[in-house]
Amino acid sequence: MASSSRFAALLLLALPALALPPSQVVPRAACATPSTVPGYNNDRLPDPFLFDDGTAVTSSADWDCRRSQIAAVVQGYEAGYLPPQPPIVSATFSSSDGTGTLTVTAGLSSDNTISFSEPITYPSGTAPAAGWPLVIAYDVLSIPVPDGIAVMVYNNDDIAQENDLSSRGVGLFYDLYGTDATASAMTAWVWGVSRIIDALETTPAANINTAKIAVTGCSRDGKGALMAGAFEPRVALTIPQESGSGGDTCWRLSKYEQDSGDVVQQATEIVTENVWFSTNFDNYVNNLSVLPYDHHELAAMVAPRPLLSYENTEYEWLSPLSAYGCMSAAHTVYEALGIPDYHGFVQVGNHSHCYFPDTLDDSLYAFFDRFLLDEDDVSTDYFTTNYQFNGTVWNASYWINWTTPQLD
């Protein structure tokens, strides 16, 4: 089955790119945002400081437009269409003994609605005047959270199922938008996070400061958390943990690792495993050079908001060189914006997958303290790796072959 899927993908490469209809490109800025870039071909990491037409990004206002372009092509090639807020969004809230339940109803019409409920665990004590900061954890909380921050465990599988390829089109999102919606499971999860924030903004009883929301998750849920931070601008802090292929690694770099003899997950395999990407991505996994973006630009979409990624070199499958190289490339955007300490990356080994060793607490708590708890005197200058890349050589000047501008 996997071989036939790859053969079909090779045939489909001869077809024109499957662009989203103009009405289905999310409008995010007053600039051209095509969902495909015909004729693009680049074996190295694409320059994030070039617009689709090849002109240079020279200001922070330009970056806003460039971010919108990246959002459009990520949807067009791999993620599928992310719908905007539907016309119906409402919420109810109940609480008891330090916990609460937020029930969100979203719909396209009065006879086409869905509802889902998410639990919130609150800190002890008196809430700040603006409400509690909140961490939204995909599926399960796998990192420590300091005192003074509420936690919601997001049941993202209810929104879009992800058991295997048979999960395509299964979940509440598809009950609303149809089983033929192009959105991948991860895109549907982003939509769910956005509806949760919509609901919290109009539910004062929940007592959440919606300007101080973080998202996190590990492994497949780390991929989802990065997507949420990239596409939902109301997320104040994004913390993907060991997201590996399809997360904070780059497709081109993971292929380079595989070609170097490393046993890593890369694009041709991941599309046969689950429904994290749209079916359209199958058309490109054997010809990655035609992608006018890579995941350094997905991560850079979070900018200028803070991003903290954790990776684990204990697991070759997670593409350790790809993660470091990809986030190094994303880091150039934060440098260009004059906020390099808004982007953290910590890569260590010697621990189990999704286990969070206490040696990482300092970096994590620094980002929480500074960006959710408003402690201004905290340093968030963390960008480190142990360079355990299984003997594969990282050549920064080859892969990151652009000059980082200063964006005023």
From Swiss-Prot:
**Example of a GO MF term:** carboxylic ester hydrolase activity
Whether Disulfide bond counts among this entry's keywords is: yes
Q: Which residues are glycosylated?
A: 287, 350, 390, 395, 401
Principal localisation? secreted
Recorded catalytic reaction(s): these are: a 4-O-methyl-alpha-D-glucuronosyl ester derivative + H2O = 4-O-methyl-alpha-D-glucuronate derivative + an alcohol + H(+)
InterPro entries recorded:
AB_hydrolase_fold, GCE-like_dom
All disulfide bonds of the chain are 31-65, 218-354, 250-326
Top-level EC class: hydrolase
Q: Which Gene3D superfamilies match?
A: alpha/beta hydrolase (3.40.50.1820)
Keywords linked to the UniProt accession: Disulfide bond, Glycoprotein, Hydrolase, Lignin degradation, Secreted, Serine esterase, Signal
- Domain of life per record: Eukaryota
Its subcellular locations are: Secreted
Output the Pfam families linked to this UniProt entry. GCE_fung
Q: What does this protein do?
A: Glucuronoyl esterase which may play a significant role in biomass degradation, as it is considered to disconnect hemicellulose from lignin through the hydrolysis of the ester bond between 4-O-methyl-D-glucuronic acid residues of glucuronoxylans and aromatic alcohols of lignin. Can hydrolyze benzyl glucuronic acid (BnGlcA), allyl glucuronic acid (allylGlcA) and to a lower degree methyl glucuronic acid (MeGlcA) in vitro.
Q: Which family does it belong to?
A: Belongs to the carbohydrate esterase 15 (CE15) family.
Q: Would you tell me the protein name for this molecule?
A: 4-O-methyl-glucuronoyl methylesterase 1
Organism listed in the record: Wolfiporia cocos (strain MD-104) (Brown rot fungus)
